[in-house]
């Protein structure tokens, strides 16, 4: 059986930090995974349900969902995923079955890691979502102007913004 999320946390949190807090930063999916668990604990709802009801629906996005682990479980309008060259196309299945699977179909427990990504939606859905959090006129934002400013503020070339890999005054935003 695959490790439980709690076991995953135990293993990851036992690893030493690469630097002291406040000295440097590094992008970490673990932070988003922890955030999804906090959302579930505080809201009393599964993460996907909470995000759909409280974030996506108010943004006008009604056809976004968390990806599944296997090709045969993908939604009708979901793309076919491919593994990047050099990433190793085949690996052992995430659930320790011993099966060798395509990395993008069974290599990871995607629903378990949902807070760190895995959201699927069309280009139109993604555009509606971004328009609802960008602070620009035309589409009502679902977050406060203060939150938009915190999320999109440019600090310096070595500092991540809140929720984005990078925000730049001229180049714009870069994905998480």
PLM features: residue spans?
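Short, surface-exposed loop or secondary-structure junction motifs
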Residues: 1-175
